[in-house]
Amino acid sequence: MLSESLTKSKLTDPLILDLLQNIREHRSMLEDLKSIKIDPKLTNIISKEIGRELYIENEFHKAKGFRKLHIEVAEFSKNLKILHCVFFPDPKFDIPIFGMDLVKINDIVSAAIVDLSPASQNQGLKYEKLLSEVDKSSFTSLREIPKWGGIFSNNVFFASLKRKSEKNDFCRVVDQYLTILIKLSKRAKPEVNEEIIQERIDFQKNYCVQQMKNEKTSMVLLKYFDEKWVNNYIKTVLFDF
């Protein structure tokens, strides 16, 4: 067992538990999976102050083809729940960036997004057709991609989930995107050309820079922490490079 169960008894939301289990199962298929040690103060963050209850727990791993596999589960003031996951590829390997976020306010899923984002020029040609074949016809409330969302693939999925059937279908879409990612990672061979590696590094840097333009992330955290802490958390834990 590489790590203890996230959130243990604190996490009871069935949708987040289902997604978490699915992500972990796919993560376990990767070769040379190892945990990454980071500052414990950034791994488990808990506040029991009444009205400002907070629970954040992070998992960090690496594997062959991936420099960082990050899962974050968070609950704010008992009504806002977030599941965030990004698998950053090792730039030596031609693998896309897997990203998934779920935002749940009480029982309403206001945002559910999943993508395999390109990590090199024309990389999407390898998998866009596979993503387009994933059935997404059942969703009724698709959302508009934000202005900074040029980092995403043509088949990024972004929606609000209204019905239980849509929540189940989102789990299926995530599962299928992860399955495609694992297949791509197993086919990928290490690159030796420094220019190609640098291009992939630049793509990941841009991915992180654009993600940091999502003001909603900092707005939530600033209700509980000062600006210095929030900036460090975003740049160190969420979108480092």
Curated annotation (Swiss-Prot):
Which top-level group of life is the source organism from?
Answer: Bacteria
The UniProt record lists the EC number as: 1.3.7.5
Please name the InterPro entries in this protein's record. Answer: Ferredoxin-dep_bilin_Rdtase (IPR009249), Ferredoxin_bilin_OxRdtase (IPR022870)
Q: Does the keyword Oxidoreductase apply?
A: yes
Does the keyword field hold Oxidoreductase? yes
Under the GO molecular function aspect, what terms does this record hold?
A: cobalt ion binding; phycocyanobilin:ferredoxin oxidoreductase activity
- Which enzyme type, at the first EC level? oxidoreductase
What reaction is this protein's catalytic activity?
(2R,3Z)-phycocyanobilin + 4 oxidized [2Fe-2S]-[ferredoxin] = biliverdin IXalpha + 4 reduced [2Fe-2S]-[ferredoxin] + 4 H(+)
- Keywords, sorted A to Z: Oxidoreductase
Question: A GO biological process this protein is involved in?
Answer: phytochromobilin biosynthetic process
Job of this protein: Catalyzes the four-electron reduction of biliverdin IX-alpha (2-electron reduction at both the A and D rings); the reaction proceeds via an isolatable 2-electron intermediate, 181,182-dihydrobiliverdin.
NCBIfam families per record: PRK02816.1
Family the entry assigns: Belongs to the HY2 family.
What protein does this entry describe?
Phycocyanobilin:ferredoxin oxidoreductase
Q: Which gene encodes it?
A: pcyA
